Amino acid sequence: MKTILGFKGLFYLHSLIWTCAGDWSAIQVHCTQFWFFARIKPTIFYNLYVNPDEVFLGDGCHVTHVLPNVYYEFFYHPHDCGIVTQPLQEVLLLKTKIRYISRDSTVRSEMPLSCVVHKQKCQ
């Protein structure tokens, strides 16, 4: 089971590297059991500039904050947007995707996102 999770992690990492062309600042993901946060650059998809109304989190959740030409932010509860919460032994794995749907053409693209929440142990 750990091997499968390791391969999935490598696949996600490879997808992130390929999509962002090595620019690690192109995306940031943070989460807790109460919120999911993603910040992306407008050029995250193949250095093609995307407008905030063309990019979505999960099942169609819109950008929640824009700093023009710098970044777009998504801030949602983990039960929103079709975010999948997968409980594992010591952690919760939150999985979703960033979707790009061009308003001027048929171009579409997706990038998987995941975030790990460490479970708090009661003492």
Swiss-Prot record:
Residue ranges of the TM segments: none
Name of the molecule in the record: Putative oocyte-secreted protein 1 homolog
Recorded GO CC terms: extracellular region
Keywords: Secreted, Signal
Originating gene: OOSP1
Secretion signal, residue range per the UniProt entry: 1-26
Compartment list: Secreted
Organism whose genome encodes this protein: Homo sapiens (Human)
Family, as annotated: Belongs to the PLAC1 family.
Role: May be involved in cell differentiation.
Main location class: secreted
